[in-house]
Amino acid sequence: MPRRIPWIIKYRPKKIADVVNQDSAKKQFIQWLESWLKGKPSKKAALLYGPAGCGKTSLVEAAANEYGLEIVEMNASDFRRRQDIERIAKTAAFMRSLFARGKIILLDEVDGISGTADRGAIDAILHLLEITRYPVVMTANNPWDQKLKPLRDASLMIAFKRLSERDVIIVLKRICQLEKLECEDAALREIARRSEGDLRSAINDLQAIAEGFGRVTLNWVRELSAYRTREYAPFEALQKMFNARYIFQAKSAISQANIDYETMMIWINEHIPTYYDDPEEIWRAYEALSRADVYMGRIRKSGSWDLLSYVFDMMGPGVAFARKIYRYKWKAFRSPKRLQLLAQTKRSREVREGIAMTLAPRLLTSRATIKRDVIPFLKIIFTHAPKYAAKIALGYGLTEEMIKWLAGPKSSEVLAYYRRLKR
């Protein structure tokens, strides 16, 4: 019996024009790839991001096919450790293709890299970008995790939008024609609706029903096609929440966001005044958000996670239905400035915390007391009395990084005395 080929492989786009929609992304990607082929790339890597099943990997494969390039593919979910990436990707970055063709190095699903378990993987990718002779393409569903910031900075960011139901239906109809399959239009519409723009899952559902029953009807789709629990990037979650027509839509948008609840609260807090224009609507939205914050505080104190449902009610429907009348409004949501500031000051806060942890047991007090009462005086000593500061640092076991943080502009002077005392 011949082996059946999955339709997502059988009908994978062979040409760039076959990739559904995504005209802006295709144009950006081709311009970047051609700049590489001419030897003058603006960025050594491109990071393609967008929802699952919207054509990111398909575009790379179609472009490689059209330009006669070999793809060296790694999936970050499978190869996570630094040595994995170095061994495979760096070999690909230098070795010529067997048929003397160019290459594209594809790192799929880089958002699958964990910040702790996969320590060193990001650094290995950054090093690869420095030495590679070939274009490097990365894909991600959600590239906005803070751990991926170095990759965002080093790459050309190319956004892919979620496919519409119409886009999905067009592809499904074409497959039905090529497979000489009897498909009800209503059934294809239902598959497309349930896919929520994920073309890959829609094709899989179509094949499963077709192979099981020989034809695709609305009844079979309703019986067998699954509603999938999808995660939304914060931008999508906010768009769905603010434009929700029904309470359940606003609530599910928040509960399915791919960031934690407290971070989502920061996103909502920043965008309420940019989305609503009416002062009363803004007040009502903040009133709902403040109640969500109260419930989160009670959860933290008591561990009563049954209150989480009320958090979702206030964050989602409470904020969304602060409006007086329904009106659809498209808004470009940006990463909150508070999160950007926290990211910029993260290392400084870590050093401050390290000083508190070092001094607290020696001074027989709490870390909070060290940060509040001791560190401000240490900063004065380290900037005005370098010799004495060096003795304190040596006596209490402070590291050179801690000295630099405390001494600021006088750090070189304090470090010189410190190193002399250590000899």
Swiss-Prot record:
The residues that hold ATP are 50-57
Keywords attached to this entry: ATP-binding, DNA replication, Nucleotide-binding
What SUPFAM superfamilies does the record tag this protein with? P-loop containing nucleoside triphosphate hydrolases
What Pfam families does this protein's entry cite? AAA (PF00004), RCF1-5-like_lid (PF21960)
GO terms (BP aspect): DNA replication
**What family is reported?**
Belongs to the activator 1 small subunits family. RfcL subfamily.
Description of how the protein assembles with itself and partners:
Heteromultimer composed of small subunits (RfcS) and large subunits (RfcL).
Protein name from the UniProt record = Replication factor C large subunit
Give the species: Staphylothermus marinus (strain ATCC 43588 / DSM 3639 / JCM 9404 / F1)
